[in-house]
Amino acid sequence: MTTTAKNISARLDLKAIGRRIREIRGFDLTQVDFGRMLGIGQTQLSKYELGQSVPTVQILLRLKTYSRKSIDWILTGEKPQAD
């Protein structure tokens, strides 16, 4: 893990992010199928869902597109603040 990734993971609750990713996946998709949709393998998706890895910006954007949830919500569980 790079220094930047370590700093980010220290400030974010990776387990909570993982729970939100699992919520986005829902019960109708397997990790294999959802991973394919995101362009990643089942092992990497599992690491995200278990809070063992920080999702890349590319994956966050794909999750946002798929779920129509904000990246703020995916990372923090909060709605984005209005400008």
Which residues make up each language-model segment?
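A short, Lys/Arg-rich alpha-helix, primarily the initiator
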Residues: M1-F27
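DNA-binding alpha-helical recognition surfaces that contact promoter or target DNA
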Residues: R19, E23, R36, K47, ...
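Helix-turn-helix/winged-helix DNA-binding modules
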Residues: G26, Q52-P55, Y66
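Short alpha-helical DNA-recognition segment
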Residues: F27-L50
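Residues in the helix-turn-helix
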Residues: Q44, V54, W73
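DNA major-groove recognition helix of helix-turn-helix/homeodomain DNA-binding modules
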Residues: Q58-W73
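Short amphipathic recognition helices of helix-turn-helix/homeodomain-type DNA-binding modules
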Residues: W73-D83
